Design a protein with these regions (language model features):
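Divalent metal-dependent phosphate-bond-processing catalytic cores, especially two-metal-ion Mg2+/Mn2+ enzymes
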Residues: 9-116
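His-Asp-centered metal-binding catalytic motifs of divalent-metal-dependent phosphohydrolases/nucleases
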Residues: 1-5
Length: 116
């Protein structure tokens, strides 16, 4: 249970629990994380990308009728993952994967908006 993302979950205490926590979180970052997030959005009937409302940007809550795209998931959850890790190795790997994910979604949004 200590490896769950939830804010009120148990915090990992042992080295093994911290390693498991970090490994679980690293799976949602980088190229694999982008692919998983997009696949999940599509399987859930949500768009790959839609611009988030101002309300979502400020509160993390969608406006009525606003889809929860993979970009929403990135903004709400994935970009914060690297700050929750415990091990030095996990943080090092996360920094690289987070940078890729950030670049990927910036590029995806720019192409979606016709800016690139």
């Amino acid at each position: 249970r200590a490896h769950r993302y939830r804010h009120n979950g148990e915090r990992p205490e042992t080295l093994e629990a911290k390693c498991l926590f970090d490994a679980d979180k690293l799976d949602v970052l980088g190229a694999v994380g982008a692919a998983r997030t997009i696949a999940y959005a599509v399987l859930a009937g949500q768009p790959v990308l839609s611009e988030p409302s101002q309300q979502f940007l400020e509160t993390g809550k969608n406006e009525p009728g606003e889809p929860h795209s993979s970009y929403h998931e990135y903004l709400f959850k994935l970009r914060k993952v690297k700050d929750k890790l415990f091990t030095k190795t996990g943080k090092t790997i996360a920094a690289d994967r987070d940078a890729f994910l950030s670049e990927f979604y910036e590029r995806l949004l720019a192409e979606y908006l016709g800016e690139r």
